[in-house]
């Protein structure tokens, strides 16, 4: 019921995380459904070990545990689950800040500027470079930029996640990449005219279909980033988040105020 309410509110990303957590816990339990009675201290401890044995990172394990805790707490509030003092006390629900996300400087330079000798990887590289040059812009924000967002040498947009209005200067080094990636197809009537051809811009779809299209585009981009990193012989893992955190780390070392970095991220 709670996941259904999240969908009605348009919070598809949050609903997706809850669904993933429940799907994972059902796999551990070996059942098609999960009851509150299956969420016990012993079960949770074994479930945590189960996740680690499958190679999940501490922060992913924590996310799944926090989703289960939230669901259980809602069950307690509604009277459908018994209150158990510190039920989740023995499992990890924190955030491991030691998980490095920024690339070393030499690998970052290779990722963004070394020729991968492949047209489709050059396109991936150009998208990554724009994300970096646009102050660590998220892939979601880049994908949803419309042609009207670009006004002379400035891009104006609202963050997808927070709706915060933002603006970034387009440097000369970014202009060629924008020209290379620019969507030259006319938009359909009453549909967004996206600057880049990452999304289709079909407003006739339901919102959840649009969310699924974005998730598909994100998975594709992350797969392409892995291919780019492999072609350039990088040893560090690379995702869209890597680019954002690499920009933040670079900006910090160059003396950019933390407040400005946090606002961009």
Task: Say what each PLM segment does.
Residues 24-27, 37, 53-87, 135:
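N-terminal DNA-binding recognition helix of tyrosine site-specific recombinases/integrases
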Residues 117, 213, 222-263:
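Short, basic (Lys/Arg/His-rich) helix/loop patches that form interaction surfaces
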Residues 73-82, 131-152, 259:
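Short, charged phosphate-coordinating catalytic segments
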Residues 85-139, 143:
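Basic, Lys/Arg- and aromatic-enriched nucleic-acid-binding interface segment
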Residues 108, 171-235:
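Active-site/catalytic core of tyrosine-dependent DNA strand-transfer enzymes
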Residues 116-118, 156-169, 208-217, 235-242:
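Short, contiguous acidic/charged loop-to-helix segments that flank catalytic cores in large enzymes
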Residues 1-54:
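Basic/aromatic-enriched alpha-helical hairpins
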Residues 144-183:
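Conserved tyrosine-mediated DNA breakage-rejoining catalytic core shared by Y-recombinases
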């Amino acid at each position: 019921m709670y996941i259904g309410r999240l969908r009605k509110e348009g919070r598809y990303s949050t609903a997706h995380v809850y669904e993933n957590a429940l799907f994972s816990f059902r796999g551990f339990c070996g059942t098609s459904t999960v009851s509150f009675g299956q969420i016990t201290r012993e079960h949770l401890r074994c479930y945590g070990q189960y996740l680690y044995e499958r190679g999940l990172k501490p922060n992913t394990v924590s996310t799944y545990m926090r989703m289960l805790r939230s669901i259980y707490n809602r069950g307690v509030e509604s009277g459908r689950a018994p209150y158990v003092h510190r039920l989740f006390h023995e499992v990890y629900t924190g955030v491991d800040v030691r998980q490095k996300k920024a690339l070393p400087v030499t690998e970052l330079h290779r990722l963004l500027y070394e020729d991968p000798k492949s047209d489709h990887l050059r396109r991936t590289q150009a998208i990554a470079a724009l994300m970096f040059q646009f102050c660590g812009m998220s892939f979601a924000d880049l994908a949803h930029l419309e042609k009207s967002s670009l006004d002379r040498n400035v891009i104006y947009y609202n963050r997808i996640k927070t709706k915060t209005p933002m603006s970034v200067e387009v440097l000369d080094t970014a202009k060629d990449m924008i020209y290379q990636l620019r969507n030259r197809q006319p938009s359909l009537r009453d549909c967004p005219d996206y600057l880049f051809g990452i999304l289709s811009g079909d407003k006739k779809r339901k919102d959840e279909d649009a969310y699924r299209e974005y998730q598909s585009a994100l998975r594709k981009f992350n797969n392409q980033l892995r291919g780019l990193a492999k072609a350039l012989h990088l040893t560090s893992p690379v995702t869209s988040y890597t680019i954002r955190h690499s920009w933040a780390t670079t900006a910090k070392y160059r003396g950019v105020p933390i407040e400005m970095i946090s606002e961009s991220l």
